[in-house]
Structure formats: C-alpha cells, structure tokens
Curated annotation (Swiss-Prot):
<dbReference type="Pfam" id="PF01073">
    <property type="entry name" value="3Beta_HSD"/>
</dbReference>
<keyword id="KW-0560">Oxidoreductase</keyword>
<feature type="active site" description="Proton acceptor">
    <location>
        <position position="147"/>
    </location>
</feature>
<dbReference type="InterPro" id="IPR002225">
    <property type="entry name" value="3Beta_OHSteriod_DH/Estase"/>
</dbReference>
<keyword id="KW-0511">Multifunctional enzyme</keyword>
<comment type="function">
    <text>Catalyzes the oxidative conversion of Delta(5)-ene-3-beta-hydroxy steroid, and the oxidative conversion of ketosteroids. The 3-beta-HSD enzymatic system plays a crucial role in the biosynthesis of all classes of hormonal steroids. During viral infection, steroid production contributes to virulence by inhibiting the host inflammatory response.</text>
</comment>
<keyword id="KW-0413">Isomerase</keyword>
<keyword id="KW-0244">Early protein</keyword>
<dbReference type="GO" id="GO:0006694">
    <property type="term" value="P:steroid biosynthetic process"/>
</dbReference>
<protein>
    <recommendedName>
        <fullName>3 beta-hydroxysteroid dehydrogenase/Delta 5--&gt;4-isomerase</fullName>
        <ecNumber>1.1.1.145</ecNumber>
        <ecNumber>5.3.3.1</ecNumber>
    </recommendedName>
</protein>
<keyword id="KW-0899">Viral immunoevasion</keyword>
<feature type="binding site">
    <location>
        <position position="151"/>
    </location>
    <ligand>
        <name>NAD(+)</name>
    </ligand>
</feature>
<dbReference type="InterPro" id="IPR050177">
    <property type="entry name" value="Lipid_A_modif_metabolic_enz"/>
</dbReference>
<keyword id="KW-0945">Host-virus interaction</keyword>
<dbReference type="GO" id="GO:0003854">
    <property type="term" value="F:3-beta-hydroxy-Delta5-steroid dehydrogenase (NAD+) activity"/>
</dbReference>
<comment type="pathway">
    <text>Lipid metabolism; steroid biosynthesis.</text>
</comment>
<dbReference type="GO" id="GO:0004769">
    <property type="term" value="F:steroid Delta-isomerase activity"/>
</dbReference>
Amino acid sequence: MAVYAVTGGAGFLGRYIVKLLISADDVQEIRVIDIVEDPQPITSKVKVINYIQCDINDFDKVREALDGVNLIIHTAALVDVFGKYTDNEIMKVNYYGTQTILAACVDLGIKYLIYTSSMEAIGPNKHGDPFIGHEHTLYDISPGHVYAKSKRMAEQLVMKANNSVIMNGAKLYTCCLRPTGIYGEGDKLTKVFYEQCKQHGNIMYRTVDDNAVHSRVYVGNAAWMHVLAAKYIQYPGSKIKGNAYFCYDYSPSCSYDMFNLLLMKPLGIEQGSRIPRWMLKMYACKNDMKRILFRKPSLLNNYTLKISNTTFEVRTNNAELDFNYSPIFDVDVAFKRTRKWLEESE
C-alpha cells in the first residue's frame, strides 16, 4: 500500500484528485500539501488523509512533508495571467518550486512524479498562431506571458529529470499532463463570468471571435487522468515515463463565449451583442497600464485578449493509447454539476 502526496491539494484541481484517490485500491495514505489551509478538508473512513501546510519553496519543510511518500502528484502553481502576482512570484512558485519538489524526490528516493503542466506550456504563442493538433504537432513555442514561460520551463525540468538517479541508486520516473481550459464546480473564473452576466441583466456580451476554437476539459476528467497516470507510471515498461499528454474529454470545442453560453443558457443567460475589437483593445491597454502603475489585476488585458482569440484545439487520443484513459464523466454530467454549483454559490 502506497503513500501519495498531492501538492496544491487544496486547490481547484488538487481537491478533485484527492477525492478520486480515496477510491484507489493501492493507496493507503494521502498527504495534501498546500500553502493555504483548506477551509473544507476532505475526510475519509477508508483512507488516511493528512493535511500539511507548507511552502513548496522551503526545502526543509517540503522534505519533512514528503518523507515516506512513494509518489507525488505536483499540482501546486500560481495560475495567473491577470496581473495579480508579480513575474518573480509566478516564477518562484511554478519553476523554482518544481525544482524543490524534484530535489526532494532525489534526496528521499521518491521514484514517481506526475506533474500538472498546462496547455500554455505549448501555446497559444506570442504571435497568435493557431494550434490544431496533438502532442507531436510541430508548433512555434514562444510564450507571451511569464505564466506560460514558467510552466514551459517547469515541464522541461520535469521531463529532463525522468530516468535520473536518486537515493540508493534507484531511478526517478516522471510524466507531465497538460490540461486545456479546465472548468467545473469550484472554478472561480467561470463563477466571475456568470456573476458578470447576472449584473448585466442575464446578458453575455461577446468578446471573442466565434472562430477562435478552444479545447476544454472537465475538472473531474482532468483529475482522473492524473490518478490513472499515477497508477500506470509504476508499471514496468510503462509508455508514459518521460512523456507529456494533453488532458482532454468530450467537452465542446468552441470559442470561450460560445462555451460559456452553452453552459449558462439553462441558467437564464442570453447572448448579447458583440463588443467591437477596437473598444476591447482600448480597455485592455488601459488595464495593462493600471497593472503596471497600481498592480491592479484585470480579466481583460492585451495578453488575455490575444490568447482568447487564438485557436488552441487539441485532437488526440494518446492518453487512451498509452495508459487506457477515457473520461469518467460525460458532458451532460459535467455541465449539470457546474450549473448546480453556480446556482448554489449565488
């Protein structure tokens, strides 16, 4: 029976991973490691779940928290393209924090690491080039924001660490998973968009080109892919060692506006008029200045305007081929759960 650690386990994705691990037969203990205290800690009658408050940049505390762990699912990150955090803060957590986790793996002899990367480790790039493809599709990877850069650098770090020698001459095996835009109950961004629509009289004003298609994935399916990868990476001859995979399911691929409308229309949200691009650009520039001068974050800035209007569509089944992944939640269930959460959070 194994001991698993989930860094960022109090977060949106991390919490769902912890929930699914409760049903994993080979897991005896789950250590939930996060810098914040979970206001609603998950409990279980069949698994030992220990919550440990810890900064992943503090090596000594990380080492103490991970002592005795067999496998790490490393989800901890600052996910920010809105200007809430400084570039240094984002890089410190996402890149240097991952360095700390890898150093602990080497020092403690932890043999398996599943890393939550991001689609932004690949794109959309700073040129606004569309991406339609899979894990092996050629694409100009040129991050346009420090968040994307930090996830790219951390992914490369984790991939390079695969098959490296750790304590007692054992080997470390790693795998990276790249969620596309995650949605579901607990998604703060979806909640913000819903609240904005309510404030505008149940109208969703359109800000995104209808042709800018984006792949999405339900949080429960992204979490399941992590749990499944954690199982398969321990098999001798496993194909996933040293590889990266996009997280996907059968959620609609469409523009952000159209996706939100599909999700929220049963809640009474109606499609509104399109805001002119010149006006969006003007507000984006204004918000960028506020961020620079006053550190005021904003959903609309030049970076978010560009990436939301740039196609990033994943077409792959590599996770199915290499570790037998298939979604465990269909789209109807995912949408119903998300809608229920939105209604209850009003």
